[in-house]
Every structure is written in C-alpha cells, then in structure tokens.
C-alpha cells in the first residue's frame, strides 16, 4: 500500500498532547495500521500454512529490537499459523536519523535457526543497509527459508539489493515516529505513525 503524503494534521483529541508540537502530521492512523496488519497476517498465513504442516515446525519470527516489537506482536496475532519469537539487538553506526550499514551485534539469537522457516520482521526499511547485513548473517546460519516483512518501506532510500516479501506501506522519505518507532527513545508509545517536526532532530 502506497502512502504519498501525510494523511492529516494533528487534532486536539489525539495522543499528540503527549509530545506537544513535536508531531508535524499523522501519516498512518492506528486504524489504517491495524487493517493492513490483518491483511499481511492473512497473506503470510496462506504462504506458510502448507510449509508449517509439512515440517511440523512453527514459523520463527525474528525481530531486531526495539522498533518492531509492537508490529511483530500484532502481526503474530494476525497470522493464522503457529509462530515463535526470537529477538536480536544490533547497533548500526551512523547519524541518529540514518544508517551506515556497519553493524555490531549487541544481543544474538537464543537458539539455532538451522532448518527453520524464518521471517525477519522489520519496522522500517530506509537505506536497506542494516537489513542487507542481517539477511546475509542469518542466511549463513542455514535456515530452511528466509523472508522479510516490513511495516514501512522508503523506496527512494533503498540502496541495498534486498528482496522484501511483505510490505505494509510504502511511505515518503520523511522521518517518522510512533507505533514502536522512536527518536532518542521517545514517541514509541503513539498508536499512530506520524512525521516528526524537523526542529526536534536538527
């Protein structure tokens, strides 16, 4: 689903009062996000139902902390096949708003993924550099299959050649926060996704 511009200005009744003046506009409402997650869950379930029945193993969803935690939780509930969770924490060197693609593992997986059907679940793919590194790293561990699902994708900023099987929304190259996405550990608690006023991070 393609989003061309911010969908609405902030209104007084929204949770923007948590951060007065910081949110420039709403890009995706909570209702839009949940509706799209339901569609993604159905699509993923259709793709993995037969695999799950054949292998007798649950779909393993791997998420990089912390941004995609809300998304992976809601997505798992929307997928009509059994799922399991694994988490990694990585540090990507670069500025506060962009990645260099140079990655250091802070927390690795707690289990072997050899022979498993793995779905990487991302919050947003912007440069694609960190995702490219993660895909190579996990592929080297010999999973049975490896696919990627992201809630948000910024096509104009993708420099790495990474195939993404499931995309929630294609969005502009705005700096966005909310629904798990942060700036300086703030704004994750918003139920919607909004664009951050540039004065906050400039």
Curated annotation (Swiss-Prot):
Pathway involvement of the protein, from the record: Purine metabolism; IMP biosynthesis via salvage pathway; IMP from hypoxanthine: step 1/1; Purine metabolism; GMP biosynthesis via salvage pathway; GMP from guanine: step 1/1
Protein species of origin: Mycobacterium tuberculosis (strain CDC 1551 / Oshkosh)
Catalytic activity as recorded in UniProt: IMP + diphosphate = hypoxanthine + 5-phospho-alpha-D-ribose 1-diphosphate; GMP + diphosphate = guanine + 5-phospho-alpha-D-ribose 1-diphosphate
EC number: 2.4.2.8
Job description of the protein: Purine salvage pathway enzyme that catalyzes the transfer of the ribosyl-5-phosphate group from 5-phospho-alpha-D-ribose 1-diphosphate (PRPP) to the N9 position of the 6-oxopurines hypoxanthine and guanine to form the corresponding ribonucleotides IMP (inosine 5'-monophosphate) and GMP (guanosine 5'-monophosphate), with the release of PPi.
Family recorded in the similarity comment: Belongs to the purine/pyrimidine phosphoribosyltransferase family.
Binding site for GMP: 154, 175-176, 182
Cofactor: Mg(2+)
Primary enzyme class: transferase
GO molecular function, one term: hypoxanthine phosphoribosyltransferase activity
Residues annotated for diphosphate binding in this entry: 66-67, 188
InterPro entries to which the protein is assigned, alphabetical: HGPRT, Hxn_phspho_trans, PRibTrfase_dom, PRTase-like
PANTHER family tied to this protein: HYPOXANTHINE PHOSPHORIBOSYLTRANSFERASE, HYPOXANTHINE-GUANINE PHOSPHORIBOSYLTRANSFERASE
Keywords attached to this entry: Cytoplasm, Glycosyltransferase, Magnesium, Metal-binding, Nucleotide-binding, Purine salvage, Transferase
Residues at the active site: 126
GO cellular component: cytosol
A Pfam entry, by short name: Pribosyltran
Positions contributing to Mg(2+) binding: 122-123
Any GO BP: purine ribonucleoside salvage
Compartment(s) of residence: Cytoplasm
The gene coding this protein: hpt
Protein name: Hypoxanthine-guanine phosphoribosyltransferase
NCBIfam families, per database record: HGPRTase
